Amino acid sequence: MKALVRVAVTGAAGQIGYSLLFRIAAGEMFGKDRSVILQMLELPDEKAQAALKGVMMELEDCAFPLLAGMVVTDNPDIAFKDADAALLVGSRPRGPGMERKDLLMENAKIFTAQGAALNKVARRDVKVLVVGNPANTNAYIAMKSAPDLNPKHFTAMLRLDHNRALSQLSTKLSKPVANIEKLIVWGNHSPTMYPDYRFATADGTPIIEAINDQAWNANSFIPTVSKRGAAIIEARGLSSAASAANAAIDHMRDWLLGSNGKWITMGVPSDGSYGIPEGMIFGFPVTTTNGEYSIVKDLPIDTFSKTYIDKTLAELEEERASIAHLLR
């Protein structure tokens, strides 16, 4: 059995948290040979803490062999103590009549505090995944609030967008998702993201040979992927939870255990690749090995792609500018 792993999960009693915790405890994120301690954070109000205790009771009742312990708390310093991994799921949702800039400001307060707590008490090599929206900018805020931690270890979740795009291509091609490789989602986890299959293959054959249809790409594929979250809310009355939790599992598992040479999409701090400003958390194609990721370099960016990448970059720059005064 490998060393015990401590994983902190914020918003632990929420819909995504509920879909996530049982799968972590079953060994789906860190492997079937690693015991886990779940360190669960929720809001300090009575209702949220009662719900969290109920989740803990259910986890106990599963008798997971790999679940070595649990902590439930409303204190980030306790939840993040010695954490090897931190999944920042909880965020302020957008309320009726709330402007996007108001949402950014509310979440900036949360992620400044959580970044500072991670900086204070987490392991120095902690790996952080931000799921709570707006995920890229929240990850940027947490990273900037944790100056003593490795900035490369602050990431945002674009894997849900990646998986959604994969599924759409699978349906279009009548091919299993497992046979499709080298798909990319560029940019922000928002409707401006750019799913890009120019380099993707199915059974080793370039997909653009099978789908050489820019009208389908622009008018069907990209809008379907970018608006999928809204379509699920309309159909279900609630936002994506199980699929978001599944994407978080995929993201962390591949980061920690390796992608075996396959391209995956992660929101990571830019190193200046593709003209994206250094430090901006942006969706890139990466490969992972030994717990570290590398951005896939030197892919050609055509005019069509540049238009979409510039649009998602502009949105991220606007978000970053709106919270810059909070990070001084």
From Swiss-Prot:
Q: Which CDD domains match?
A: MDH_chloroplast-like
Query: Which portions of this protein are annotated as coiled-coil regions?
Result: none
One BP annotation, GO:
tricarboxylic acid cycle
Q: What is its EC number?
A: 1.1.1.37
Q: Does the UniProt entry include the keyword Transit peptide?
A: no
Name the SUPFAM superfamilies on file: LDH C-terminal domain-like, NAD(P)-binding Rossmann-fold domains
Q: Where is the active site?
A: 189
What are the entry keywords? NAD, Oxidoreductase, Tricarboxylic acid cycle
Q: Which residues bind substrate?
A: 94, 100, 133, 164
Q: Which Pfam families match?
A: Ldh_1_C, Ldh_1_N
**Span of the secretion signal?**
none
One GO molecular-function entry: L-malate dehydrogenase (NAD+) activity
Residue numbers binding NAD(+): 11-17, 107, 114, 131-133
Q: Which HAMAP family match?
A: Malate_dehydrog_2 (MF_01517)
What biological function has been recorded for the protein in this entry?
Catalyzes the reversible oxidation of malate to oxaloacetate.
Q: What is this protein called?
A: Malate dehydrogenase
